Amino acid sequence: MKKIYNVYFLCGFATLGGGLFGFDISSMSGVLGTAAYTNYFQVGSGQYKQGSITCAMPFGSLVGALCSSFIADRYSRVRAIQFSSILWIIGSIFMCASNGIPLLVVGRVIAGGCVGIASAMVPVYQAEIAPKEIRGRVISLQQWAITWGILIQYFIQYGASNIDGGPNNPTQSTAAFRIPWGIQIVPGVILFFGMFLFPKSPRWLASKDRWEEALQVLSKLHGQGDVNHPKVLAEYKEIQEALALEREQSATGFQELIKPRIFKRVILGMSLQMWSQLCGMNVMMYYIVYIMQSTGAGSPLLTASIQYILNTALTLPAIIYLDKFGRRPAILIGFFLQAIFLYLEGGLQGGFGAPNPHTDPKLDAISWTVADHPAVGKAIIALSYLFVCSFATTIGPTSWTYPAEIYPAKVRAKAVSLATASNWIWNCLLALFVPPLLWSINWKMYMIFAAFNTAAFIHMFLTAPETKGYTLEEMDDVFDSGLPAWRKLERKSRMEELEKEIIEGNLKITPAHEATGVSATHVTPEKQV
């Protein structure tokens, strides 16, 4: 089957996997406020049942993320993403057909397996096929796709919530939640068939000693099909050298991850994904309807929808400018602003709020309200929007870009799967415990998440160096330089040096890679490989 080699198309289409992640995030938020969902599943007060339903998908995603590297390393990144789409289709069918909480939970766990695999392997595939000049841009497309998935699913649910007289009609049909859960099958089907058009990652091919194929793919991705293009040969040579070094070190698999030079990067990637959850964004996504209800918003579903639009729109600037301004500034600015907005939001909730008198049955899911202070309610809504905007332009894109690019090729899939698993562990815990926390400690929860953002800012300032402008094979130099994280490694690009030598005729790369030898043979007056 004929393959497509346009990097932007490949990276953009692959983010349908991120879109499924977005469908997951808002797969509950739009139905929580409907009578059909509440009456059919009998979630009740206290929210432990709802927390269990919500966290089923993050739990499945955790399992999927942990398994993703085994599938991706053995069968390729492309086949791993394709397999994930099958899980999504099966899980969505179960959700759509659910006749009670048990089948709904099973469906969400299976669909979650898809999201775990896709969320780990889509950024890896993007990082391995994109040139360094646009790597941040194309990987951040993953976050944009997530926001589109959130937005599209939410508005599908918002439209379906008006079936049979609207969300407050006690006799509302179950179509209010079955239609949205059924429609989400469609992108899974598109992703499955679309992946047949994708070439395998050249770095994965090289790791399997399929060097001729790797060179052909590189040439079509970055050299318009010319296997002798200097940029293609330089990248090919750099991959050779990196794999040779890794093989000399002999260790493979997870034991390689505990070596000090790699382990610190594993912890960094896992930490960034952890902080991206503990910053509070997914609370805004999963349970925004409850937050809007506590402010006395006239139409919580409609008011909540604005933040989904902002989330999608404000991710676009990050895609455009991430490769210009860098990852580190985005991370630090993001956590700083998010902390400020949450401290203010928690202060307003605590200073002007009061226990919910439960005079309105539609508001039984919340225990704290500022409805008696309309101006304060509007300020809280505005702060929620500002929080979402700051996340969308900073932490959202970088939390996927940064972990996908900081590891050596030999352990990249495994390390990214652990980083993504960290995301899903905390996602699962938050989905389970936030509803009872909102119920029991209400406004204090905002202060807890604000403190997490403060801690994240300090941690990332001390440990996260800039990665903009380096090839994947140069990340070892960045992290092994001995420089503090706030100082950027100043050095010439190894790939640019190789490209220059090739152009000048001082370095010759033999396109046909013979056997498994990857070392350079020096001759005078030229170098030959």
Curated annotation (Swiss-Prot):
Membrane topology: Multi-pass membrane protein
Transmembrane domains' residue ranges: 7-27, 52-72, 86-106, 109-129, 138-158, 179-199, 272-292, 301-321, 330-350, 375-395, 415-439, 446-464
Disulfide pattern: none
GO (cellular component) term, any one: membrane
Annotated GO MF terms: carbohydrate:proton symporter activity
Compartmental location: Membrane
Factors inducing expression: Expression is induced by the developmental and secondary metabolism regulator veA.
Keyword line: Membrane, Sugar transport, Transmembrane, Transmembrane helix, Transport
Family: Belongs to the major facilitator superfamily. Sugar transporter (TC 2.A.1.1) family.
NCBIfam families recorded: SP
Role summary: Probable MFS glucose transporter; part of the gene cluster 27 that mediates the biosynthesis of asparasone A, a sclerotium-specific anthraquinone pigment important for sclerotial survival.
Protein name: MFS glucose transporter mfs1
